Amino acid sequence: TATTRRRGRPPGFSPFR
């Protein structure tokens, strides 16, 4: 999911994807 783009970058997730 690309929801991390608006939430920032959680541990284990990339800010780009």
Curated annotation (Swiss-Prot):
Expressed by the venom gland. The keyword Glycoprotein applies. GO terms for cellular component: extracellular region. Glycans are attached at residues 3-4. GO terms for molecular function: toxin activity. It is found in: Secreted. Its main location: secreted. Keywords: Bradykinin receptor impairing toxin, G-protein coupled receptor impairing toxin, Glycoprotein, Hypotensive agent, Secreted, Toxin, Vasoactive, Vasodilator. One of its GO terms (biological process) is vasodilation. Belongs to the bradykinin-related peptide family. Induces smooth muscle contraction. May target bradykinin receptors (BDKRB). May cause hypotension. This is Vespulakinin-1.
